[in-house]
């Protein structure tokens, strides 16, 4: 008899818990934050935001003063990056996304890759961190600057990513296309370092804050890679011609084996949304 009562009590507790969870789920508002590759900073940023919101929601559910008045549940899946996130927000599939400030500008103004697809309702929520655009090269490739990429195997980034867009902007400013390289790849940010360490590519371009764990891996693996300088009148022209670009420097010693400063240009990582998303959620 005691066993029956104990079992019945357990069932009732589980049932009560499920009702409680169902009530919370029904009252919660779900939304999605687009991020980037699973090893990148955007993915970490999106999931950190979700974690903070979940913690706040749990506090409120338990009657704590610092909790939110309304329960929010969010997901932050790995995605193709900046332009993909903006496109999904425009389509109403995502409510938020992390994106480079340059692609935020182009989407709002209908320029560059967003020509004919203007997204005037795109809004910035806040900036996260600075992101220098870095071109990394393996040591044996002997690449010192952009001209040294001629005849090399270069990863230009996956379609829809911020790194792909910025690389194409830089190539356009330099007056070159894909034929300038021996060949190009379209690897994601999470794939490119392994490809370099395995000797499959000579170089890649990437917009990312520093220091970065994946870049340190590129510096310490068999590639012995390091960031190169991006300077000259063409790069300065990009900086002078756009408010979202600025000169950036990766100080020497940031990465293993980096003996000199690497001068380049950079943008900011921003969390963006749509004007159609309710103010209460933002």
Model-inferred region functions:
Residues 1-12:
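Bacterial N-terminal signal peptides that target proteins for export
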Residues 11-25:
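C-terminal segment of classical bacterial N-terminal signal peptides
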Residues 28, 69-71, 81-84, 91, ...:
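Extracytoplasmic
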Residues 30-62, 72, 131-198:
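Bilobed "Venus flytrap"/periplasmic-binding protein-like clamshell domains
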Residues 32, 75, 95-100, 124-126, ...:
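Structural recognition of the beta-strand scaffold that forms the well-ordered cores
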Residues 47, 65-116, 190-195, 201, ...:
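Pocket-flanking alpha-helical
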Residues 98, 102-142, 146:
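Signal peptide-directed extracytoplasmic domains
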Residues 101-103, 112-113, 141, 177-278:
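Pocket-lining segment of extracytoplasmic ligand-binding domains
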């Amino acid at each position: 008899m005691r066993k029956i009562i104990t079992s019945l009590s357990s069932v009732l507790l589980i049932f009560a818990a499920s009702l409680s969870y169902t009530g919370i789920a029904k009252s919660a508002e779900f939304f999605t934050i687009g991020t980037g590759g699973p090893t990148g900073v955007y993915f970490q940023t999106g999931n950190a935001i979700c974690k903070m919101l979940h913690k706040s929601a749990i506090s409120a559910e338990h009657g704590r003063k610092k909790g939110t008045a309304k329960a929010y549940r969010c997901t932050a899946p790995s995605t193709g990056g900046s332009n993909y996130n903006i496109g999904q927000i425009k389509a109403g599939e995502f409510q938020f996304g992390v994106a480079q400030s340059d692609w935020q500008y182009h989407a709002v103004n209908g320029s560059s890759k967003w020509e004919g697809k203007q997204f005037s309702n795109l809004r910035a929520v806040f900036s996260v961190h600075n992101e220098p655009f870095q071109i990394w090269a393996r040591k044996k490739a002997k690449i010192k600057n952009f001209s040294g990429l001629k005849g090399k195997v270069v990863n230009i980034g996956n379609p829809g990513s911020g790194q792909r867009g910025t690389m194409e902007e830089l190539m356009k400013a330099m007056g070159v296309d894909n034929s300038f390289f021996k060949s190009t790849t379209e690897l994601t940010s999470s794939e490119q370092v392994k490809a370099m360490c395995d000797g499959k590519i000579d170089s890649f371009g990437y917009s990312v804050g520093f220091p970065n764990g994946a870049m340190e891996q590129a510096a310490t693996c068999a590639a012995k890679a390091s960031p190169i300088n991006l300077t000259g009148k063409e790069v300065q022209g990009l900086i002078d011609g756009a408010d979202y670009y600025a000169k950036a420097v990766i100080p020497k010693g940031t990465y293993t084996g980096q003996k000199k400063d690497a001068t380049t240009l950079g943008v900011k990582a921003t969390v963006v949304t749509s004007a159609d998303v309710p103010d209460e959620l933002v």
